[in-house]
Amino acid sequence: MKTLLIAALAAAPLFAGNAELADAIQSGRRAAAIEMIAKKSADVNAADADGTTPLLWAANANDTDLVSRLLKAGANPNQRNLLGSTPLSEAALNSNTEIVQILLSAGADPNAPGADGQTPLMVVARTANVAAAKLLLDKGANVNVKEAQRGQTALMWAAASSQGPMMRELLAHGAEVDAKSATDMMTPLISKEPRSQPRPPGAMTAMLFSTREGCMDCVQALVEKGAKVDLPDPEGITPLISAIFNAHFDVAKFLIEKGANVNRWDWWGRSPLYLAVDYNTLPHGGRPDQPSIDETLPIDIVRILLEKGANPNLQLKMLPPYRATGADRGVDQMLTVGTTPLLRAAKAQDAAAIQLLLEHGAIVDLPNSQGMTPTVAAAGTGSVDADTRGYYYAADIQDRAIASLDLLLAHGGELNGRAGRLEQAPLHGAAFWGWNKVVEHLLAKGADINLKDSRGFTAVDYAMGRAGGNSRGGQRIDVHKETGDLIIAKGGIAGTPVQQSARPRGPAGP
């Protein structure tokens, strides 16, 4: 038995008048109910404790015959229970077209709202029952009325449920294509944490619901009716950003083809290009990567965006929410203010994205607010195990790093450039992770084997775990004696650290 719209008070021991008929239908004693109706021995409108009438219970049970008998006996098709539910809203919830038609023919109000302002049309809109929606609309259901809690219309409900055909029916009956839901104006709380404060949620459009769900048919239906493809929510998230963020790359491609702004960023400064690069190598919270089912891949979106004029040098405006953890605690300090798509790609040793970005004018060593550059990041510098989730131990990581470094160096990246708060060089990062192949590759290209960071540490110190900690499961994983011996054999020496008044703040590691 469905109970979404019927109050849980039905089991209460109190009764409002003679509710024998309602009790019989609710408890499944159908024969007894039919007998009471036939003999007129019970009031067909007598409700039980929560105001639920026999007709509402019959609609809830999908009992077409009982619904017809009750109406012929004088049941009120518009009588509500304490939650504002009517027989019509219950039939809509059950997606029962026949009962919807019977009730409407008997005078049921197609616009009767529940306690939260939700109408039968909104309820039907979440289903695939276009026929029931058409019955309601033909009887005068208001297609643009909003429910009270979130200010959402039937079109938004349909979009959030990926009901393309339903949306087309609603749009054909005049649904406002760009209507916005309410904005949740919560009282802001002062936070001492160094992280961005989100904008008030809400102001969602049917387009934003559709792109969030990845419903191509829904998006196409809206575009055909003239929906604005760049209308954002209060956080600046546009339909294109929403589609990419939620891994709906076919939808993203369609929006780009329809003229979506490829350079519009959100509250945090994330452009569509940044998010596409981000998703191309995004680990999902320690679990295996979950590839999209779309034909279009993230790297395809990167290419399409660049071909459409996306600016590869747009920088983040603030530290964005961290996608791979349950809460934004600003874990990854490298991908912060000033980070470019190229730096994001370099951090992941994503040679394919790096090549595309460089070919389209990315500035090779544009630093972020921490002074970190793509060339230094590509060698593993600036990251710790906490924000790579084991990614830096993949079997092909060193080959990826070498390919990425070669691209960056060929476009002007500095082999001995020092970056970040600790002024680290590419060789420091490779030594820190114990990447022997990368160390040898950098040295063969002429990397300064004894270059020191701002504290006086050399690559030998990084390899031996003296220049910063890294641990997993409480065990240190930052001592790579083989790497240290390799560097020493080639002339490397340990540095003489300068006196530090305090260790620089931020994650441990390079």
Regions found by a protein language model. Name each.
Residues 8-16:
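Hydrophobic h-region of N-terminal signal peptides that target proteins for export
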Residues 17-57:
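N-terminal segments that cap or nucleate solenoid repeat domains
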Residues 30-37, 63-71, 96-104, 129-137, ...:
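Ankyrin repeat structural motif
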Residues 51, 84, 117, 150-151, ...:
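Start-of-repeat signature of ankyrin repeats
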